[in-house]
C-alpha cells in the first residue's frame, strides 16, 4: 500500500513540474514553428518584392496566408498593426521581438534595409539562401533525434524475450512486460511518423478532427499501464484493440502525407519549368497549357481559371501563390526561379527525413504486433 502511495506522490510532483514548465515549452514550440516557416516566409516575401510590391503590401499579404504560414501570418499581422500604430514600418521591424532569436534577427535585418531606403529584395534573397541551408541542417538533426529515440525503443522491444525468460525462470510476473513493449512500440511509431514532412503538410479538417481521437487512445494505453491504487493490468485484448484503433485512425493522415510529398516533387519541377519558359519569352497562359504533370495539373488549371487551389503541401501552395503573382504582375521568371529553388530544397530535406524514418515506422508496427501475439502464448 505504501508503495502505491509513493507512486501517486511521485506522479503528483511530476505533474506539478510539467505544469510549471508548460509556458516555457509552449514558447519553444512557437519558436520552432516560426523557424520552420521562415524559408517559406522569406521566399513569399521575395517573390512579391521582385514583382514590384512594397514591403508593407507584401507583409499585409503574408498576414492573410493562414494556410501557408499558420504561425508566421500572425507575426506579420502584428508587425503591420505595430507599424500602423507607430507610423513607421522599418521601426516596427527593428524593434519587433519573437520567441525565436533567429527570426527576430532576420526581421531586424529586413528592417535595417528598409530604414536605409534601399530595395529590401536583395537582402531578403541573401537571407533566404542562408535559411535554406539552415532548414536542411535542421531536418537532418531532427532525423537524428528521432532515430535516437526510435533506437532506444527498439532496444527495449528486442530485449523483451530476455525479460520473459528471466521472469519465467525466477517465477516472476509477466504482466508489466507487454504494456512496456506496446508503449515502446507506440513511442517508436510516433517518433517516426510525427516528423515525416508534417511542417509542410496541410492536413484537411477531417484529418484534424481525427488527431484528438488518436491522442485519446495513446493516453488510454498509458493510463491502463500504470499500476496505481491496486488497479490490475488489463487483458492484452484491450492493447490489441488500442493498437488496431491507432493504425485505423492513422490511415487518412498517412494518405494525405503521401499525397503532399508527391505534390512537393511536382511543385518544384513545376516552378522550375515555368520559370524557364517565362525567361525564354513564353506567354504565361501558354506556359500553363504546357503543364502535363498529373500531380499538379489540376491545381495549375484552378489557378489559370481563377479558382482557389487546395494543395496538401505548403510548398506547392507557395509555388501556386507565386505563379498567381507573376501572372498578375508580369514580373517574369526570376521571382519564380527563386521560389523554385526554395521549393526544391524543402522537398529534398523532408524527403530524406521521411525515407530515414520509414524503416522505424515499419519495425515499430511489426514489433508491436508480434509482442501482442506473444502475449497469448
Segments the model singles out, each with a brief description of its role:
Residues 1, 9-21, 131, 135-194, ...:
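Bilayer-spanning, highly hydrophobic alpha-helical transmembrane segments
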Residues 4, 90-97, 167-180, 232-236, ...:
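Membrane-interfacial helix-loop-helix connectors in multipass membrane proteins
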Residues 8-97, 105, 205-308, 318-321, ...:
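Juxtamembrane/interface alpha-helical elements of multi-pass membrane proteins
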Residues 116-144, 318, 326-348:
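Membrane-proximal, non-transmembrane alpha-helical segments
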Residues 124, 190-203:
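Juxtamembrane segments at transmembrane-helix boundaries
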Residues 315:
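Catalytic core of the metallo-beta-lactamase
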Amino acid at each position: 500500500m505504501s508503495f502505491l502511495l509513493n507512486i501517486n506522490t511521485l506522479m503528483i510532483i511530476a505533474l506539478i513540474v510539467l505544469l510549471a514548465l508548460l509556458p516555457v515549452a509552449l514558447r519553444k514550440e512557437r519558436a520552432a514553428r516560426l523557424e520552420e516557416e521562415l524559408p517559406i516566409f522569406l521566399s513569399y516575401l521575395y517573390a512579391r518584392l521582385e514583382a514590384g510590391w512594397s514591403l508593407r503590401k507584401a507583409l499585409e499579404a503574408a498576414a492573410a496566408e493562414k494556410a501557408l504560414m499558420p504561425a508566421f501570418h500572425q507575426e506579420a499581422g502584428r508587425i503591420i498593426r505595430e507599424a500602423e500604430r507607430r507610423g513607421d514600418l522599418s521601426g516596427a521591424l527593428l524593434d519587433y521581438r519573437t520567441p525565436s532569436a533567429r527570426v527576430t534577427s532576420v526581421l531586424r535585418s529586413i528592417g535595417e534595409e528598409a530604414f536605409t531606403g534601399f530595395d529590401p529584395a536583395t537582402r531578403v534573397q541573401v537571407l533566404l539562401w542562408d535559411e535554406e541551408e539552415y532548414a536542411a541542417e535542421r531536418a537532418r538533426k531532427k532525423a537524428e533525434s528521432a532515430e535516437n529515440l526510435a533506437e532506444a525503443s527498439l532496444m527495449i522491444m528486442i530485449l523483451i524475450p530476455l525479460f520473459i525468460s528471466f521472469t519465467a525462470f525466477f517465477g516472476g510476473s509477466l504482466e508489466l512486460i507487454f504494456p512496456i513493449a506496446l508503449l515502446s512500440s507506440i513511442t517508436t511509431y510516433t517518433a517516426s511518423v510525427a516528423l515525416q514532412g508534417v511542417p509542410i503538410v496541410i492536413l484537411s479538417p477531417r484529418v484534424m478532427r481525427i488527431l484528438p481521437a488518436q491522442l485519446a487512445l495513446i493516453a488510454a494505453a498509458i493510463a491502463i499501464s500504470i499500476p496505481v491504487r491496486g488497479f490490475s493490468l488489463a487483458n492484452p485484448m484491450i492493447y490489441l484493440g488500442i493498437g488496431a484503433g491507432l493504425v485505423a485512425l492513422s490511415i487518412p493522415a498517412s494518405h494525405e502525407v503521401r499525397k503532399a510529398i508527391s505534390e512537393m516533387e511536382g511543385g518544384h519541377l513545376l516552378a522550375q519549368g515555368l520559370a524557364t519558359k517565362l525567361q525564354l519569352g513564353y506567354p504565361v497562359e501558354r506556359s500553363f497549357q504546357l503543364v502535363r504533370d498529373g500531380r499538379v495539373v489540376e491545381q495549375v488549371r484552378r489557378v489559370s481559371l481563377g479558382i482557389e487551389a487546395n494543395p496538401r503541401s505548403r510548398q506547392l501552395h507557395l509555388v501556386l501563390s507565386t505563379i498567381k503573382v507573376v501572372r498578375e504582375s508580369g514580373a517574369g521568371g526570376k521571382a519564380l526561379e527563386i521560389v523554385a529553388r526554395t521549393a526544391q530544397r524543402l522537398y529534398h530535406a523532408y524527403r530524406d527525413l521521411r525515407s530515414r524514418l520509414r524503416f522505424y515506422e515499419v519495425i515499430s508496427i511489426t514489433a508491436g504486433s508480434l509482442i501482442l501475439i506473444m502475449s497469448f502464448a
